[in-house]
């Protein structure tokens, strides 16, 4: 077993799907080796007496036989299997679990709703960047977890008896996507939420994070439709109107919505609209991980880092042997430029963070080859697992690195949706200039500079005589000024 002792597995027997995650511990973080998900729809097999049908149990056992094959290489002490809402509820859960344990060869633990909520929060805390004080929402098949917390500590935990499968069976049983069904589903969800809303609001949050298939589906829809990745009530209402327009569940077609997710999408959407309305949520983003990640990090006993993005960047720099001193040098110059123009350009703090992150990784392409290094950098960043960064933020970083030098590909900056296109252009300009002025790879050779913005015009003022004393530098800046002018970015250098 010595060679496999760094492997860990987490299995989540959910009400809608069964999931298995297999990871390897690498430098205080986890590297995903296997993810398997199977739609089992266990909750749909509950009858009015809360007994699971034989068919539903057989679907579950069949899935576990697939999982069992992969578990043979992992020490039992490094496997955790948990069951959630449906198996908490089912009167014959014991029958299902006995056979499940026999198939898997390890214990299956039915966890309480509060424990599920705590584990979901831990998974989010380990994998999701942004503000420390958060509200986490996870809409499962038969339960919905709502958790507030700061850093690694939860402040309130709730597990509510509503989910996308149970709401589908209850409010969309006729498969009709009419306004009446949505109204009934939302009203019922708000009634379930009302008793806990005050306590959640009392603890408060600076950022709201969604950690479920419904939120994942929304993210995929918004990416496919070129919207930014922030989920708002307005966008949810638009999608509801689109669903109503489709008329029936089997005719539901929305750009970016997969067939696999379509069945429980309207019911999940109704619950999410109720949560947004009842808790007055302004905006939600997708979490980097949830229950399974919480289980894995719990087995590894890893502390929650204050800044997940920084940990990710450090790990990538080590792995690809990036020159950390140079990355810091470029970041320092870029930060200085950013601070000088942020008021004129109305830039937000998150834009500064993303610019600095791009600086930290800008030489990653050299690990492949100097030729086409920006393209290699963009490919690597687009395809690496970057905990703490959302999919849209990864796309922005890749786009910035693609455009760090040479003529600018304006269309790529407009295709990302982490920030408005104009902001992506502005960050790109600052990154390119920072790379140029830190290119000598010595702190004492970075000149004192001022950068002023007047609408799109950038005016860079260098020390007197600098351009005369640095003919190569002068040539590089003249070329850069020309490249920026091609895309209507005026740059004056004095």
Swiss-Prot record:
Pathway the protein contributes to: Purine metabolism; ppGpp biosynthesis; ppGpp from GTP: step 2/2
Enzyme class, first EC level, given as a word: hydrolase
Gene3D superfamilies linked to this entry: 3.30.420.40, Exopolyphosphatase. Domain 2, Hypothetical protein af1432
GO biological process assignments: guanosine pentaphosphate catabolic process; guanosine tetraphosphate biosynthetic process; nucleobase-containing small molecule interconversion
CDD domains, per database record: ASKHA_NBD_EcGppA-like (cd24117)
EC number annotated for this UniProt entry: 3.6.1.40
Entry-linked Pfam families: Ppx-GppA, Ppx-GppA_III
GO MF: guanosine-5'-triphosphate,3'-diphosphate diphosphatase activity
Sorted UniProt keywords: Hydrolase
Catalytic activity of the protein: guanosine 3'-diphosphate 5'-triphosphate + H2O = guanosine 3',5'-bis(diphosphate) + phosphate + H(+)
Superkingdom of source: Bacteria
InterPro entries noted in UniProt: ATPase_NBD, GppA/Ppx_hydrolase, Guo-5TP_3DP_PyrP, Ppx_GppA_C, Ppx_GppA_N, PyroPPase_GppA_Ppx
Alphabetized NCBIfam families for the sequence: PRK11031.1 (NF008260)
Function, in words: Catalyzes the conversion of pppGpp to ppGpp. Guanosine pentaphosphate (pppGpp) is a cytoplasmic signaling molecule which together with ppGpp controls the 'stringent response', an adaptive process that allows bacteria to respond to amino acid starvation, resulting in the coordinated regulation of numerous cellular activities.
Entry similarity comment: Belongs to the GppA/Ppx family. GppA subfamily.
Name this polypeptide is given: Guanosine-5'-triphosphate,3'-diphosphate pyrophosphatase
Annotated organism of origin: Escherichia coli (strain 55989 / EAEC)
Lineage: Bacteria, Pseudomonadati, Pseudomonadota, Gammaproteobacteria, Enterobacterales
Gene name for this UniProt entry: gppA
């Amino acid at each position: 077993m010595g060679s496999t002792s760094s492997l860990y597995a987490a299995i989540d027997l959910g009400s809608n799907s069964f999931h298995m995650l297999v990871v390897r511990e690498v430098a205080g973080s986890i590297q995903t080796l296997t993810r398997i998900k199977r739609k089992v729809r266990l909750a749909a097999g509950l009858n009015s007496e809360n007994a699971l049908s034989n068919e539903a149990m057989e679907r579950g056992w069949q899935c576990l036989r697939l999982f069992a094959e992969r578990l043979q290489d992992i020490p039992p002490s490094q496997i955790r299997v948990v069951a959630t809402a449906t198996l908490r509820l089912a009167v014959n859960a014991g029958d299902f679990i006995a056979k499940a344990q026999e198939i898997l060869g390890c214990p299956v633990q039915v966890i309480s709703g509060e424990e599920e909520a705590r584990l979901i929060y831990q998974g989010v805390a380990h994998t999701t960047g942004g503000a420390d004080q958060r509200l986490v929402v996870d809409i499962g098949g038969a339960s919905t977890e709502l958790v507030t917390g700061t850093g690694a500590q939860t402040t309130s935990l709730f597990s509510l008896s509503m989910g996308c499968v149970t709401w589908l069976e209850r409010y969309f049983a006729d498969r009709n996507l009419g306004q009446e069904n949505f109204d009934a589903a939302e009203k019922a969800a708000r009634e379930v939420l009302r008793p806990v809303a005050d306590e959640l609001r009392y603890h408060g949050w600076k950022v709201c994070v969604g950690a479920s298939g419904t939120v994942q589906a929304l993210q995929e829809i918004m990416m496919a439709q070129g919207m930014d990745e922030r989920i708002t009530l307005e966008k949810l209402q638009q999608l509801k109107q689109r669903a109503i327009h489709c008329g029936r569940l089997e005719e539901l077609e929305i750009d970016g919505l997969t067939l696999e997710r379509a069945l429980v999408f309207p019911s999940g959407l109704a619950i999410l609209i109720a949560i947004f309305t009842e808790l007055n949520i302004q905006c939600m983003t997708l979490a980097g991980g949830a229950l399974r990640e919480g289980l894995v990090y719990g087995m590894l006993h890893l502390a929650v880092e204050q800044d997940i993005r920084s940990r990710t960047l450090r790990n990538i720099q080590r792995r690809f042997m990036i020159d950390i001193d140079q990355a810091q040098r470029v970041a320092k110059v870029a930060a200085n430029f950013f601070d000088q123009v942020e008021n004129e350009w109305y830039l937000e703090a998150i834009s500064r963070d993303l610019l600095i992150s791009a600086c930290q990784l800008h030489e990653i392409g050299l690990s492949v080859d100097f030729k086409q290094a920006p393209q290699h950098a963009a490919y690597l960043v687009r395809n690496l697992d970057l905990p703490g960064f959302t999919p849209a933020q990864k796309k922005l970083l890749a786009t910035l690195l693609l455009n760090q030098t040479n003529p600018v590909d304006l269309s790529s900056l407009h295709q990302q949706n982490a920030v408005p296109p104009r902001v992506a252009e502005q960050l790109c300009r600052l990154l390119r200039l920072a790379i140029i002025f830190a290119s000598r790879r010595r702190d004492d050779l970075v000149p004192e500079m001022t950068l002023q913005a007047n609408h799109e015009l950038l005016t860079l003022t260098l020390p007197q005589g600098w351009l005369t004393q640095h003919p190569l530098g002068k040539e590089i800046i003249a070329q850069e000024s020309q490249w920026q002018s091609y895309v209507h970015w005026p740059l004056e250098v004095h």
